[in-house]
Structures are given as structure tokens and as C-alpha cells.
């Protein structure tokens, strides 16, 4: 059985046993070695380059690999097959999907102003901030030979008195740890739960000083995932962060993700990539940053496109791309954090913003709601320009929407220098109109060298080239320009 050694730039080598004829890109994915493949391995993007260091691969020159590069050992992993033992070098850019965790500066005036404006606008539209979750600290008499009331009844009586409710529900996940927590804290505890009319449903029992009740809002983009923790009592933001979507190594757009999840074991791989590799680490990081415990998250909401929603819950998404393009669900009720093994409170409801169609999902539902165009007399245009691009047009009388694939057109597609907004990407550009000298801004630490151009950089460059009359309105270079060769 052949062995393939992946020498990852800046990382430890990974050795994998395989069979003759195995596709190198598929082998790398099975070994969790990240190789950038926006087209998901169909050979059209030319981004999945690796370098053969030792041994042989069945691979041939292509339009993406010149004869000179081929002689140097460069290959496309998607079109390379294993023929025996070999060692390949994987460039660091291949792990670009593993974007470094970024935590926002919540004290910045811009962050505060945007959030406050959103809340104010929703309130004016009749959507008020409400909270049915409670954290109550109760003290109970410790049991004795003269007081043999069981723990659950002791807690129930204390909560009925503290909250003025008629009924208290203690679910299994709380009951199994109740005895330990009560005695560890001398029967002085904080109980968190949901107040539903005259019923209080316990969700967590913990130390009396742990009184935080937290909400978690998640935007699952095809390329980037952003998360916000909020205080459910005050509505204030506690922490905010973002990271790359771990699914990116299975394709840059939703079509390639759907194709990949249709392969044997594909759904589990893509669900693990978004949950275990992406969401769970962000939750742990933000809870630590905010100084709260993960079980304090009592409610979660998710905004994502239709395909991302399917892959999140592990539902087959094939019907999304097949005629007549009918998703498995628009609205999903009753989903809990424990169903997805998310490290929040196991009983936390997970609200998935409803999808509208196969390619217009809950992210647009949420964005339309937050933008307020649904409650305005003026005709407005709401644009979400990400990996998936969506547009909503209308006012309080009507709303129409459409979608397209936007990000890969800039980042992978047929732009040889295109890349995502990770280290080494040119993200902004200005051109001096007199000297025609360009100045660029590059993602990464100081001294970072340019590797390619991301979407915002390409838009900036085109804008500057046109402003300085280096290109014309048709996008063609003006040949008499002093900098044109």
C-alpha cells in the first residue's frame, strides 16, 4: 500500500496510506489536509497546486500548469493520481480557508452606532426587544433526617415562590446533575430557564454567581462565518468574532458543496466542517472573551443561505440544485442545540431564519428584516454581495428577490490572481493621478507580501484604473497611457 507524505508549509507533515489510483485532492481531504480548490476539483480553477518533491504522480501538464512549472514539480492535485510512494509540498496559501479568528472591537463608535440604529429601527417598526429567559438565584434549606424532601421538589418549591409561577419543569439534562450542583453550592444556586406564562422551564442549574443569560446570533456565509453574543437581559453585545467557513475546502460555491455532500459520507463531512471545525471553536472563543460559560447561551439564531442551512442540519441538499429546485425545508421549528451537538445550553432553541427559495435563504430574510425596507414607503434595494450574491427590491407593498454566484467570480473563477480575503490578499488600492503610482493595502501583519487580489481589491483596482483614465468605460486599457506597455 503506497504512502503519501503531505509536507504542509508552516505545519507538520501528514502521512497517509492509500491505494494506487487514488485522487490526490480526495486523499488530502480524507486526511484533513487543506488544499484550496474553489471549483471542488473539476479542473477549472487551477488553484489546487501542489509540488511533487519525491516519487511519482500520474499527472500531465494543463492550461493551468506550464511546461516549465511541470518540470519544477508543480501539479494540480485534482488531476493527479497516486502511483506509488511520494512526497508533495502543500503551499501555505492552501490553508487559506482556515482564516484566523478575528474578534471585533465592540467599543468602536461604528459598531455601537450600527447596532443601536438597527434596534431603534426595528422598535419603530413594532418589533420590540423582549426576553422570556430568566436567571434566578434561590436558597433552599439543606435536607436532613427531619427534612427528607427530594431535590427536585425542593427546587420546584423555591422557584414557584421566587417567580410566582404555578408549574416548574425540570428536564432530564438538568435533573441528572441537580444533586451534585445543589450540594456543591450548599443549596444556594442560580437557575436559568424560560418563562412561559405560568410555567418556568429549567434549562441550567449552576453556581449562584453565574447569572449571565446569553443569546447567540450566527451568520453562516459560504466563505466566512460571523457570530455575536448578546446579553438577553439588556440586549447589549458581549462579544463578536468571525472565522473562515471550514467547508471551503470542499468548494468555493454552493453548487460544488452540494455535489460534494452527495458523495458517500459527504453530508457528515460538510456538517462536521461547519460545526466541529467552525462554529464550536468560535463559540468557545467568544464565551471566553465575554467571560461567560457556554451553557449560559439559552437561545441561538442562524442566518444562512438555503444550502448552508441544509448542510448545517445534515439534510440532503441535492434537490436544491435539481429541477424543480425544491429545498427540503423553508422553515424549521423545534431545533435545539443538543440536536446539533453545539456547545451551548443543550435545551437552547436554535432559530433558523426561514429560507425563501433554493438560492434565496435565511440570510436574506434576516437582512431584509434588519434593513427595514419591508416597512418603508420608499422603493429600496438591499444587496448582499458575498460568495452568494442576493438582491431584494421593493417596499412595504411588495418585495422581489434574486440571487447569483458573486464571490468566486472575483476570488477563484478565471482570474489568475484572484483569492479570498486572507493573508497576502490585496484588499484596497489607490492610484496617484499624476504619477500613476499605485498604493495597495494587503491583508495580514506588517510586512506581509502580496499573494493575490481579493474581491474588494479587484473592485478598487478597476475603479482606480478608470478614475485615472488607464482603462475606459468598456474596461479596455487606454494604449496612450504613460504606464501602459
Language-model segment annotations:
Residues 1-14:
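Eukaryote-biased recognition of intrinsically disordered, low-complexity regulatory segments
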Residues 17-61, 227, 241, 282, ...:
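N-terminal cofactor/phosphate-binding cores enriched in small/glycine residues
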Residues 461-485:
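Gly/charged contiguous loops adjacent to phosphate- or pyrophosphate-bearing nucleotide/cofactor binding elements
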Residues 246-289, 414-415, 424-430:
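N-terminal phosphate-binding loop and adjacent alpha-helix
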Residues 27-31, 36, 47-97:
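Iron-sulfur (Fe-S) cluster-binding segments and ferredoxin-like electron-carrier domains
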Residues 69-71, 76-217, 222, 234, ...:
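Nucleotide/phosphate-binding catalytic cleft detector across ATP-hydrolyzing
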Residues 218-222, 227-255, 319-333, 366, ...:
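Glycine-rich phosphate-binding loop of actin/hexokinase-like ATP-binding domains
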Residues 47, 296-306, 385-387, 478-484:
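A glycine-rich phosphate-binding loop feature that marks nucleotide/adenosyl-phosphate handling sites
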Amino acid at each position: 500500500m503506497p504512502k503519501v507524505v503531505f509536507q504542509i508549509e508552516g505545519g507538520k507533515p501528514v502521512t497517509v496510506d492509500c491505494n494506487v489510483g487514488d485522487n490526490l485532492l480526495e486523499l488530502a481531504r480524507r486526511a484533513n489536509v487543506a488544499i484550496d480548490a474553489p471549483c471542488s476539483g473539476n479542473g477549472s480553477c487551477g488553484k489546487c497546486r501542489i509540488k511533487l518533491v519525491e516519487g511519482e504522480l500520474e499527472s500531465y501538464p494543463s492550461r493551468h500548469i506550464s511546461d516549465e512549472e511541470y518540470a519544477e514539480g508543480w501539479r494540480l492535485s485534482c488531476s493527479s493520481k497516486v502511483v506509488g510512494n511520494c512526497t508533495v509540498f502543500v503551499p501555505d496559501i492552501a490553508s487559506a480557508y482556515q482564516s484566523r479568528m478575528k474578534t471585533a472591537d465592540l467599543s468602536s463608535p461604528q459598531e455601537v452606532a450600527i447596532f443601536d440604529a438597527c434596534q431603534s429601527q426595528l422598535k419603530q417598526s413594532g418589533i420590540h426587544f423582549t426576553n422570556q429567559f430568566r436567571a434566578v438565584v434561590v436558597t433552599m434549606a439543606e435536607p436532613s433526617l427531619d427534612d427528607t424532601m427530594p431535590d427536585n421538589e425542593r427546587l420546584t418549591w423555591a422557584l414557584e415562590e421566587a417567580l410566582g409561577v404555578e408549574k416548574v419543569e425540570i428536564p432530564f439534562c438538568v435533573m441528572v446533575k441537580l444533586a451534585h450542583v445543589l450540594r456543591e453550592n450548599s443549596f444556594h444556586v442560580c437557575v436559568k430557564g424560560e418563562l412561559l406564562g405560568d410555567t418556568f422551564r429549567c434549562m441550567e442549574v449552576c453556581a449562584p454567581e453565574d447569572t449571565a443569560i446569553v443569546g447567540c446570533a450566527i451568520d453562516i456565509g459560504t466563505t466566512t462565518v460571523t457570530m455575536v453574543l448578546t446579553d438577553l437581559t439588556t440586549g447589549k453585545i458581549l462579544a463578536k468574532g468571525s472565522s473562515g467557513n471550514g467547508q471551503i475546502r470542499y468548494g468555493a460555491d454552493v453548487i460544488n458543496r452540494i455535489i460534494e455532500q452527495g458523495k458517500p459520507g459527504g453530508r457528515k463531512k460538510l456538517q462536521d466542517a461547519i460545526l466541529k471545525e467552525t462554529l464550536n471553536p468560535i463559540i468557545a472563543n467568544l464565551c471566553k472573551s465575554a467571560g461567560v460559560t457556554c451553557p449560559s447561551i439559552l437561545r441561538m439564531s442562524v442566518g444562512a443561505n438555503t444550502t448552508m442551512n441544509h448542510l448545517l442540519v445534515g439534510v440532503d441538499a441535492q434537490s436544491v440544485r435539481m429541477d424543480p429546485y425544491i429545498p427540503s425545508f423553508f422553515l424549521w421549528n423545534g431545533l435545539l442545540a443538543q440536536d446539533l451537538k453545539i456547545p451551548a445550553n443543550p435545551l437552547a432553541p436554535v432559530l433558523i431564519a426561514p429560507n425563501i427559495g433554493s438560492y434565496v435563504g435565511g440570510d436574506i430574510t434576516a437582512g431584509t428584516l434588519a434593513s427595514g425596507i419591508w416597512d418603508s414607503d420608499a422603493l429600496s434595494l438591499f444587496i448582499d454581495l458575498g460568495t452568494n450574491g442576493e438582491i431584494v427590491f421593493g417596499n412595504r407593498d411588495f418585495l422581489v428577490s434574486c440571487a447569483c454566484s458573486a464571490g468566486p467570480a472575483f476570488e477563484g473563477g478565471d482570474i489568475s490572481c484572484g483569492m479570498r480575503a486572507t493573508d497576502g490578499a490585496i484588499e484596497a488600492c489607490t492610484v496617484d493621478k499624476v504619477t500613476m503610482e499605485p498604493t495597495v493595502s494587503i491583508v495580514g501583519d506588517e510586512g506581509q507580501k502580496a499573494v493575490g487580489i481579493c474581491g474588494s481589491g479587484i473592485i478598487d483596482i478597476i475603479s482606480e484604473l478608470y478614475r485615472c483614465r488607464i482603462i475606459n468605460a468598456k474596461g479596455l486599457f487606454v494604449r496612450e497611457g504613460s504606464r501602459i506597455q
